Amino acid sequence: VDLSKVAYDIPMALFIKEAKEPGSLRFNGFYSDDGVTLSDWELKFGAGMAHGVAKLAAKGAQEITIQSATAGGIQGQGKVIIQDNHLGIVGRLQVLDLDHVYHHYNSDAEESPYSIDADLKIEQLKLSQKLNFGQVNLRVTESKGDLTSLKLISEKPDVLEVFVTPEKSGVKHITLSCHNAGDVLDYFMPNSDFEGGTLNLVGQLSGKPGHKVFKAEIDLRDFVVIKAPLLAQILSLSSLDGIMRTLTGQGVSFSNAVGHLEWGNDKVILKDIHASGSSIALTLDGTVNLLTDNIAVEGELYPINSLNVMLANIPLVGQVLGGGKSRGVFATAFNLTGKRQNPVISANPLSTIAPQSVKELYKKQVNNEK
Protein backbone atom coordinates (compact mmCIF):
# COMPACT_ATOMS: atom_id res chain seq x y z
CA VAL A 1 0.00 0.00 0.00
CA ASP A 2 1.47 3.33 -1.08
CA LEU A 3 1.37 5.94 1.72
CA SER A 4 3.70 8.49 0.16
CA LYS A 5 0.91 11.05 -0.30
CA VAL A 6 -0.29 10.79 3.30
CA ALA A 7 0.69 13.52 5.77
CA TYR A 8 0.54 12.90 9.51
CA ASP A 9 2.05 14.16 12.74
CA ILE A 10 2.39 13.05 16.36
CA PRO A 11 3.32 16.25 18.27
CA MET A 12 4.04 14.48 21.58
CA ALA A 13 6.65 12.32 19.83
CA LEU A 14 8.01 15.21 17.73
CA PHE A 15 7.13 13.14 14.66
CA ILE A 16 6.05 14.65 11.32
CA LYS A 17 5.39 12.80 8.05
CA GLU A 18 5.15 15.17 5.08
CA ALA A 19 3.03 14.27 2.05
CA LYS A 20 6.12 14.21 -0.17
CA GLU A 21 8.01 11.74 2.03
CA PRO A 22 8.01 8.02 1.17
CA GLY A 23 5.59 5.72 2.95
CA SER A 24 4.35 2.17 2.51
CA LEU A 25 2.54 -0.68 4.27
CA ARG A 26 3.54 -4.25 3.38
CA PHE A 27 1.94 -7.36 4.85
CA ASN A 28 1.72 -11.14 4.43
CA GLY A 29 -1.13 -13.24 5.73
CA PHE A 30 -4.19 -15.31 5.00
CA TYR A 31 -7.95 -14.99 5.20
CA SER A 32 -10.38 -17.41 6.91
CA ASP A 33 -13.95 -17.35 8.17
CA ASP A 34 -12.62 -16.09 11.50
CA GLY A 35 -10.95 -13.07 9.92
CA VAL A 36 -7.50 -12.08 8.68
CA THR A 37 -4.22 -13.25 10.19
CA LEU A 38 -1.11 -11.27 9.31
CA SER A 39 2.04 -13.32 9.80
CA ASP A 40 4.12 -10.24 9.10
CA TRP A 41 3.44 -6.56 8.49
CA GLU A 42 5.81 -3.64 8.04
CA LEU A 43 5.03 0.07 8.04
CA LYS A 44 7.49 2.64 6.68
CA PHE A 45 6.23 6.15 7.23
CA GLY A 46 8.70 8.94 6.58
CA ALA A 47 11.36 8.65 9.29
CA GLY A 48 9.12 6.33 11.32
CA MET A 49 8.76 2.59 11.05
CA ALA A 50 7.03 -0.35 12.72
CA HIS A 51 6.61 -4.08 12.16
CA GLY A 52 4.85 -7.01 13.79
CA VAL A 53 1.97 -9.48 13.46
CA ALA A 54 -1.81 -9.14 13.75
CA LYS A 55 -5.10 -11.01 14.13
CA LEU A 56 -8.02 -9.08 12.65
CA ALA A 57 -11.10 -11.04 13.71
CA ALA A 58 -14.32 -10.93 11.71
CA LYS A 59 -16.14 -10.49 15.01
CA GLY A 60 -14.81 -9.40 18.37
CA ALA A 61 -11.41 -7.96 19.26
CA GLN A 62 -8.68 -6.98 16.81
CA GLU A 63 -5.18 -7.76 18.09
CA ILE A 64 -2.11 -5.98 16.70
CA THR A 65 1.34 -6.90 18.02
CA ILE A 66 4.06 -4.30 17.49
CA GLN A 67 7.42 -6.04 17.69
CA SER A 68 9.34 -2.82 17.14
CA ALA A 69 8.41 0.79 16.43
CA THR A 70 10.16 4.14 16.05
CA ALA A 71 8.40 7.50 15.71
CA GLY A 72 10.28 10.70 16.40
CA GLY A 73 11.71 10.49 19.90
CA ILE A 74 9.81 7.34 20.88
CA GLN A 75 10.96 3.74 20.49
CA GLY A 76 9.22 0.67 21.83
CA GLN A 77 7.09 -2.41 21.37
CA GLY A 78 3.73 -3.63 22.58
CA LYS A 79 0.27 -4.92 21.83
CA VAL A 80 -2.93 -3.07 20.91
CA ILE A 81 -6.33 -4.71 21.34
CA ILE A 82 -9.27 -2.95 19.68
CA GLN A 83 -12.85 -3.87 20.50
CA ASP A 84 -15.74 -1.64 19.56
CA ASN A 85 -14.54 1.85 20.58
CA HIS A 86 -12.09 0.69 23.23
CA LEU A 87 -8.30 0.52 22.82
CA GLY A 88 -6.26 -1.57 25.25
CA ILE A 89 -2.50 -0.96 25.07
CA VAL A 90 0.24 -2.93 26.82
CA GLY A 91 3.88 -2.28 26.04
CA ARG A 92 7.33 -0.97 26.75
CA LEU A 93 8.98 2.32 25.74
CA GLN A 94 12.71 2.91 25.71
CA VAL A 95 12.45 6.65 26.39
CA LEU A 96 9.63 9.12 27.01
CA ASP A 97 10.31 12.84 27.44
CA LEU A 98 7.57 14.59 29.43
CA ASP A 99 8.73 17.89 27.95
CA HIS A 100 7.14 16.91 24.62
CA VAL A 101 3.92 15.80 26.34
CA TYR A 102 3.70 19.00 28.40
CA HIS A 103 4.14 21.32 25.42
CA HIS A 104 1.84 19.46 23.03
CA TYR A 105 -0.91 18.01 25.21
CA ASN A 106 -4.21 19.73 24.48
CA SER A 107 -6.80 19.20 27.22
CA ASP A 108 -9.39 21.01 25.09
CA ALA A 109 -8.90 18.86 21.98
CA GLU A 110 -11.89 17.62 20.02
CA GLU A 111 -13.76 14.72 21.56
CA SER A 112 -12.45 11.31 20.48
CA PRO A 113 -14.80 8.36 19.87
CA TYR A 114 -12.34 6.02 21.61
CA SER A 115 -11.65 5.14 25.21
CA ILE A 116 -8.08 4.11 26.00
CA ASP A 117 -6.57 1.95 28.73
CA ALA A 118 -2.76 1.86 28.57
CA ASP A 119 -0.30 -0.04 30.76
CA LEU A 120 3.32 0.84 29.93
CA LYS A 121 6.76 0.22 31.34
CA ILE A 122 9.11 3.08 30.46
CA GLU A 123 12.85 2.44 30.70
CA GLN A 124 13.77 6.13 30.93
CA LEU A 125 11.29 8.84 31.86
CA LYS A 126 12.83 12.26 31.29
CA LEU A 127 11.85 15.88 31.79
CA SER A 128 13.81 17.76 29.13
CA GLN A 129 17.53 17.53 29.86
CA LYS A 130 17.10 18.44 33.51
CA LEU A 131 15.79 15.23 35.01
CA ASN A 132 15.90 11.50 34.42
CA PHE A 133 13.51 9.61 36.71
CA GLY A 134 14.76 6.24 35.49
CA GLN A 135 12.41 3.31 34.98
CA VAL A 136 8.73 3.89 35.74
CA ASN A 137 5.41 2.09 35.40
CA LEU A 138 2.53 4.04 33.86
CA ARG A 139 -1.16 3.21 33.88
CA VAL A 140 -3.43 5.74 32.19
CA THR A 141 -7.05 5.80 31.07
CA GLU A 142 -8.72 8.21 28.69
CA SER A 143 -12.34 8.60 27.62
CA LYS A 144 -13.48 10.63 24.63
CA GLY A 145 -10.20 12.55 24.57
CA ASP A 146 -10.24 13.38 28.29
CA LEU A 147 -7.69 12.01 30.75
CA THR A 148 -9.72 10.10 33.35
CA SER A 149 -7.04 8.53 35.55
CA LEU A 150 -3.28 8.20 35.84
CA LYS A 151 -0.89 6.21 38.00
CA LEU A 152 2.84 6.80 37.52
CA ILE A 153 5.33 5.18 39.92
CA SER A 154 9.11 4.97 39.62
CA GLU A 155 10.82 1.59 40.06
CA LYS A 156 13.26 3.21 42.49
CA PRO A 157 11.39 4.12 45.70
CA ASP A 158 10.60 7.77 46.47
CA VAL A 159 11.86 9.12 43.12
CA LEU A 160 8.49 9.94 41.52
CA GLU A 161 4.82 9.21 42.16
CA VAL A 162 1.88 10.84 40.36
CA PHE A 163 -1.79 9.95 40.78
CA VAL A 164 -4.87 11.38 39.05
CA THR A 165 -8.21 9.99 40.24
CA PRO A 166 -11.34 9.67 38.09
CA GLU A 167 -13.55 12.76 38.16
CA LYS A 168 -16.20 12.86 40.88
CA SER A 169 -18.72 15.69 41.23
CA GLY A 170 -16.72 17.69 38.67
CA VAL A 171 -13.40 17.37 40.54
CA LYS A 172 -10.25 15.37 39.83
CA HIS A 173 -7.80 14.80 42.68
CA ILE A 174 -4.10 15.00 41.84
CA THR A 175 -1.14 14.07 44.03
CA LEU A 176 2.56 14.32 43.22
CA SER A 177 5.70 13.36 45.10
CA CYS A 178 9.22 13.66 43.72
CA HIS A 179 12.83 14.17 44.67
CA ASN A 180 15.18 16.68 43.01
CA ALA A 181 12.36 19.17 43.42
CA GLY A 182 14.69 22.05 42.57
CA ASP A 183 15.14 20.77 39.02
CA VAL A 184 11.38 20.26 38.63
CA LEU A 185 10.66 23.80 39.83
CA ASP A 186 13.40 25.19 37.59
CA TYR A 187 11.74 23.50 34.59
CA PHE A 188 8.42 25.27 35.22
CA MET A 189 10.00 28.45 36.64
CA PRO A 190 13.41 28.97 34.96
CA ASN A 191 16.15 30.56 37.07
CA SER A 192 14.29 29.77 40.30
CA ASP A 193 17.68 29.04 41.95
CA PHE A 194 16.42 26.01 43.91
CA GLU A 195 18.54 22.89 44.36
CA GLY A 196 17.60 19.47 45.73
CA GLY A 197 14.64 18.91 47.99
CA THR A 198 11.54 16.74 48.05
CA LEU A 199 8.21 18.05 46.76
CA ASN A 200 4.79 16.81 47.86
CA LEU A 201 1.68 18.28 46.25
CA VAL A 202 -2.00 17.52 46.81
CA GLY A 203 -4.53 19.30 44.61
CA GLN A 204 -7.88 19.42 42.89
CA LEU A 205 -8.65 20.17 39.24
CA SER A 206 -12.12 21.50 38.47
CA GLY A 207 -13.99 23.66 35.99
CA LYS A 208 -15.18 23.46 32.41
CA PRO A 209 -12.85 22.84 29.41
CA GLY A 210 -10.92 26.02 28.68
CA HIS A 211 -11.55 27.32 32.21
CA LYS A 212 -9.90 24.69 34.39
CA VAL A 213 -8.63 25.74 37.82
CA PHE A 214 -6.04 23.79 39.80
CA LYS A 215 -5.87 24.38 43.57
CA ALA A 216 -3.17 22.69 45.60
CA GLU A 217 -1.29 22.49 48.87
CA ILE A 218 2.49 22.26 48.52
CA ASP A 219 5.11 20.92 50.90
CA LEU A 220 8.77 21.34 49.93
CA ARG A 221 11.46 19.87 52.22
CA ASP A 222 15.24 20.11 52.58
CA PHE A 223 16.19 22.38 49.68
CA VAL A 224 18.89 24.98 49.06
CA VAL A 225 18.55 28.43 47.47
CA ILE A 226 21.72 29.56 45.66
CA LYS A 227 22.47 33.03 44.25
CA ALA A 228 18.81 34.12 43.83
CA PRO A 229 19.37 37.82 42.96
CA LEU A 230 15.91 38.86 44.20
CA LEU A 231 16.46 37.30 47.60
CA ALA A 232 19.97 38.81 47.71
CA GLN A 233 18.53 42.31 47.18
CA ILE A 234 15.95 41.80 49.92
CA LEU A 235 18.68 40.57 52.29
CA SER A 236 20.74 43.64 51.43
CA LEU A 237 17.80 45.94 52.16
CA SER A 238 17.34 44.10 55.46
CA SER A 239 21.02 44.65 56.37
CA LEU A 240 21.51 40.87 56.60
CA ASP A 241 24.87 40.96 54.83
CA GLY A 242 26.19 37.78 56.44
CA ILE A 243 23.29 35.70 55.16
CA MET A 244 23.62 37.37 51.75
CA ARG A 245 27.25 36.21 51.51
CA THR A 246 26.11 32.67 52.35
CA LEU A 247 23.45 32.89 49.64
CA THR A 248 25.95 33.87 46.94
CA GLY A 249 28.37 31.16 48.11
CA GLN A 250 27.20 27.76 49.28
CA GLY A 251 23.55 28.82 49.40
CA VAL A 252 20.94 29.15 52.13
CA SER A 253 19.36 25.91 53.37
CA PHE A 254 15.64 25.63 54.04
CA SER A 255 14.10 22.79 56.01
CA ASN A 256 10.58 23.30 54.66
CA ALA A 257 8.24 25.50 52.66
CA VAL A 258 4.46 25.07 52.79
CA GLY A 259 1.49 26.92 51.39
CA HIS A 260 -1.29 27.03 48.82
CA LEU A 261 -1.37 27.84 45.12
CA GLU A 262 -4.13 28.33 42.59
CA TRP A 263 -3.44 27.97 38.87
CA GLY A 264 -6.10 28.99 36.38
CA ASN A 265 -7.36 31.76 34.09
CA ASP A 266 -3.73 32.45 33.08
CA LYS A 267 -2.73 33.29 36.66
CA VAL A 268 -0.88 31.62 39.51
CA ILE A 269 -1.97 32.79 42.96
CA LEU A 270 0.30 32.17 45.95
CA LYS A 271 -1.38 32.03 49.35
CA ASP A 272 0.21 31.75 52.80
CA ILE A 273 3.59 30.52 51.60
CA HIS A 274 5.88 30.00 54.59
CA ALA A 275 9.53 28.94 54.19
CA SER A 276 11.85 28.31 57.11
CA GLY A 277 15.55 27.53 57.23
CA SER A 278 18.53 27.56 59.54
CA SER A 279 19.23 31.28 59.10
CA ILE A 280 16.13 33.00 57.64
CA ALA A 281 12.40 32.54 57.17
CA LEU A 282 10.03 33.96 54.55
CA THR A 283 6.33 34.52 54.05
CA LEU A 284 4.83 35.18 50.60
CA ASP A 285 1.42 36.05 49.13
CA GLY A 286 0.70 37.30 45.63
CA THR A 287 -0.10 36.72 41.98
CA VAL A 288 1.82 35.84 38.81
CA ASN A 289 0.08 36.79 35.54
CA LEU A 290 1.15 34.20 32.95
CA LEU A 291 -0.06 36.29 30.00
CA THR A 292 1.73 39.52 30.86
CA ASP A 293 4.50 37.90 32.97
CA ASN A 294 3.81 40.50 35.66
CA ILE A 295 3.97 39.73 39.37
CA ALA A 296 2.54 41.36 42.48
CA VAL A 297 3.93 39.65 45.57
CA GLU A 298 4.24 40.82 49.16
CA GLY A 299 6.08 39.13 51.97
CA GLU A 300 8.24 39.28 55.06
CA LEU A 301 11.78 38.10 55.71
CA TYR A 302 13.18 37.60 59.17
CA PRO A 303 16.41 36.12 60.51
CA ILE A 304 16.33 32.94 62.55
CA ASN A 305 18.46 33.63 65.61
CA SER A 306 18.13 33.01 69.32
CA LEU A 307 17.09 36.59 70.17
CA ASN A 308 14.43 36.79 67.46
CA VAL A 309 12.97 33.39 68.37
CA MET A 310 13.10 34.10 72.10
CA LEU A 311 11.27 37.43 71.79
CA ALA A 312 8.65 35.97 69.44
CA ASN A 313 7.88 33.28 72.02
CA ILE A 314 7.30 35.73 74.88
CA PRO A 315 3.45 35.92 74.90
CA LEU A 316 2.91 39.67 75.15
CA VAL A 317 6.08 40.82 73.36
CA GLY A 318 5.74 38.33 70.54
CA GLN A 319 2.08 39.16 69.95
CA VAL A 320 2.53 42.94 69.96
CA LEU A 321 5.82 43.22 68.08
CA GLY A 322 5.88 40.14 65.89
CA GLY A 323 2.33 38.92 65.48
CA GLY A 324 2.79 35.62 67.31
CA LYS A 325 5.17 32.67 67.65
CA SER A 326 5.12 31.90 63.92
CA ARG A 327 6.66 35.27 63.01
CA GLY A 328 9.87 36.96 64.11
CA VAL A 329 10.01 40.24 65.99
CA PHE A 330 12.76 41.56 63.70
CA ALA A 331 11.43 41.26 60.14
CA THR A 332 11.49 43.20 56.88
CA ALA A 333 8.28 43.66 54.88
CA PHE A 334 8.83 43.78 51.11
CA ASN A 335 6.95 43.91 47.81
CA LEU A 336 7.80 42.65 44.33
CA THR A 337 6.01 44.25 41.36
CA GLY A 338 6.51 44.40 37.60
CA LYS A 339 7.98 41.85 35.20
CA ARG A 340 8.80 38.47 36.74
CA GLN A 341 12.35 38.37 35.38
CA ASN A 342 13.21 41.86 36.63
CA PRO A 343 10.69 43.07 39.21
CA VAL A 344 10.86 46.25 41.25
CA ILE A 345 11.70 45.53 44.89
CA SER A 346 10.41 47.85 47.58
CA ALA A 347 11.04 47.31 51.27
CA ASN A 348 10.16 49.22 54.41
CA PRO A 349 13.49 50.29 55.92
CA LEU A 350 11.82 50.79 59.32
CA SER A 351 9.99 47.46 59.44
CA THR A 352 13.07 45.47 60.46
CA ILE A 353 12.71 46.78 64.03
CA ALA A 354 9.10 47.98 63.86
CA PRO A 355 6.09 46.55 65.72
CA GLN A 356 3.71 44.37 63.71
CA SER A 357 1.16 47.19 63.51
CA VAL A 358 3.65 49.37 61.60
CA LYS A 359 4.40 46.54 59.17
CA GLU A 360 0.72 46.05 58.42
CA LEU A 361 0.33 49.81 57.90
CA TYR A 362 3.20 49.74 55.41
CA LYS A 363 1.58 46.90 53.47
CA LYS A 364 -1.71 48.80 53.27
CA GLN A 365 0.11 51.91 52.06
CA VAL A 366 1.86 49.99 49.27
CA ASN A 367 -1.39 48.31 48.22
CA ASN A 368 -3.13 51.70 48.06
CA GLU A 369 -0.36 53.04 45.83
CA LYS A 370 -0.95 50.18 43.39
PLM feature spans:
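A short, well-structured beta->alpha microelement
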Residues: 43-49
